[in-house]
């Protein structure tokens, strides 16, 4: 998803734990109900403490093999996909959440400074304009 840039449906995001809930009716009412439910429970985990999936992947050399192969095949010569993979590797292998976040921030800044960034923005908006 991150490398290919393909969108994910809300239902799939919910199933995979990317989001906590989907609003089916009034966003405001659903948001208030969601918050009241969270306030009423004793569980208030921070994102930084939700590491079950990361711990499962730690030490598995093959966990990012598919992403690396996809990047090599479909994003050859592009800078950002390698940085995305490096961010995920840091999240998996770094014990300290703050150190992992710092690495992600550094990789992101490298993407911002890379000359490909501006070219990719032009391509994106050019494709949008051409499809209208």
Which role does the model predict for each range below?
Residues 1-107, 125-126, 131:
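Amphipathic alpha-helical segments at domain termini/boundaries
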Residues 113-132:
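Short, structured interface segments
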């Amino acid at each position: 998803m991150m490398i290919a840039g393909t969108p994910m449906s809300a239902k799939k995001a919910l199933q995979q734990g990317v989001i906590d809930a989907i609003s089916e009716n009034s966003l405001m009412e659903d948001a208030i109900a969601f918050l009241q439910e969270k306030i009423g429970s004793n569980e208030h985990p921070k994102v930084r403490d939700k590491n079950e999936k990361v711990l499962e992947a730690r030490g598995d050399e093959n966990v990012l093999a598919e992403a690396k192969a996809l990047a090599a095949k479909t994003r050859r010569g592009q800078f950002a996909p390698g940085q995305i993979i490096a961010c995920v590797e840091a999240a998996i292998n770094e014990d300290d959440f703050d150190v992992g976040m710092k690495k992600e921030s550094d990789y992101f800044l490298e993407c911002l400074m890379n000359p490909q960034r501006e070219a990719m923005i032009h391509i994106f908006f050019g494709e949008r304009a051409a499809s209208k």
